[in-house]
A protein has these predicted regions:
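Membrane-interface junctions at transmembrane-helix termini in multi-pass inner-membrane proteins
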Residues: 1-15, 238-268, 278
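Membrane-interface helix-loop junctions in multi-pass transport and translocation proteins
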Residues: 5, 9, 20-59, 260, ...
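Helix-loop junctions and terminal segments of transmembrane helices
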Residues: 162-184, 196
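Residue-level signature of transmembrane alpha-helical cores of multipass secondary-active transporters
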Residues: 11, 15, 48-51, 55, ...
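Short alpha-helical transmembrane segments in multi-pass integral membrane proteins
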Residues: 39-93, 100-104, 191-211, 217-221, ...
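Alpha-helical transmembrane segments of polytopic membrane transporters and translocases
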Residues: 110, 143-165, 196-198
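Alpha-helical transmembrane segments
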Residues: 249-257, 307-324
Length: 350
């Protein structure tokens, strides 16, 4: 509701409170339970309980904030009552609660379904990789577990750029949908292109940095990890840009009322990932490197599908050169400079 009103401050405070109380309460509960002699399983349960406590605190904050700042808007917004500032000549009435619920479900279910499908496909993919490493590539269970473990470490860093883009996608949805509702299609198109440009400015340098500096990053964060780590991170660094692009494109499609199309792209991308991994991971010479390649290919496919949907459904073709040219050029120069400086430092400093 606050985001729909263009107010992101409550969301920021809410997220900070949730994380803060989750960590503090979880640590306190785990420590108290362990000192009381309940053992590690119960202590772990106490730490997990901190997640619920953080969620409850954040919910209470939003309820209090809503009552303090938006309570004056609640009373008039009931079925059959004119909205504030309406004149007697206005025929438009506020939608009923049932219609609002139906609209929310019709929009939310495809979005939630697409997210669930991707999570399910990722779970299937993890099982598939372990199985193909053993049954087809000929690795032992321990070797396959080590390879998939280092892939999981690279995934942690791979998810970092998307963490910066997700809040932006939340912010642009009401901006674009509001412009479309007012009939300001030109403003909606400009906002869409600006959002994609901001996404590129953030994700391209981060992706290039992860790719170029994969070796030192993995060695610093995971010094005793498997040697495959830097190569995996380098591939996933390239994929991270397409992940951010897909997130922004999904937000644009959802804001314009085409949320079902995002579900199609998510399912298609997940299936592509499974197919690519099925063949590549089975090759002993490729093994676990096939997993990040599958991720890269799947998100490239999703980005292209979303772009086509935006062009067809919205009758608008974003100017890709104007959006990506300068961020890409700057990122390449940055990557070259970072690689050269790291090489010099490693050579003379060690």
């Amino acid at each position: 509701y606050c985001q729909g009103n263009g107010n992101m401050i409550p969301t920021t405070v809410d997220e900070v409170l949730e994380v803060l109380f989750k960590v503090i309460s979880g640590l306190i509960l785990a420590s108290c339970l362990l000192r009381a002699g309940y053992g590690k399983p119960v202590g772990s349960a106490g730490a997990i309980l901190g997640v619920s406590i953080g969620s409850v605190i954040s919910l209470l904050y939003m309820i209090i904030y809503k009552r303090r700042h938006y309570s004056e808007l609640s009373a008039p917004y009931t079925a059959g009552i004119h909205a504030p500032n309406d004149t007697p000549d206005d025929d438009e009435l506020v939608d009923s609660a049932w219609k609002i619920v139906k609209d929310i479900l019709s929009i939310g279910i495809p979005i939630a379904f697409g997210a669930c499908i991707m999570a399910i496909l990722n779970s299937v993919d993890s099982k598939l990789c372990m199985n193909r490493l053993q049954s087809a590539a000929g690795f032992s269970y321990y070797q396959a577990k080590v390879l998939y473990g280092v892939y999981g470490k690279a995934q942690t860093l791979f998810n970092l750029p998307a963490a910066f883009i997700t809040p932006l996608t939340i912010a642009i949805v009401p901006e674009i949908s509001g412009a479309i509702a007012k009939g300001a299609n030109a403003a909606a198109r400009k906002t869409s292109e600006d959002a994609m440009r901001i996404s590129a400015v953030i994700s391209l340098p981060m992706g290039v940095g992860l790719t170029v500096l994969a070796y030192p990053i993995m060695n610093v964060l995971y010094p005793n990890s498997n040697a495959a780590g830097p190569g995996l991170l380098a591939i996933m660094g390239a994929a991270s840009f397409f992940v951010c692009t897909v997130l922004m494109e999904n937000a644009i499609l959802q804001a314009s009322g085409h949320e079902k199309l995002t579900m199609v792209t998510m399912i298609s991308g997940g299936l592509v990932k499974i197919i690519v991994n099925w063949f590549l991971v089975a090759q002993r010479s490729i093994n676990i490197y096939g997993a990040p390649v599958g991720t890269l290919v799947s998100y490239v496919v999703m980005a292209l599908m979303n772009y086509i949907f935006i062009c067809v459904a919205l009758r608008h073709r974003p100017k890709l050169f104007g959006i990506f040219a300068r961020p890409l050029a700057a990122s390449v120069l940055m990557g070259a400079a970072a690689w050269a400086i790291y090489g010099l430092c490693a050579r003379f400093i060690g």
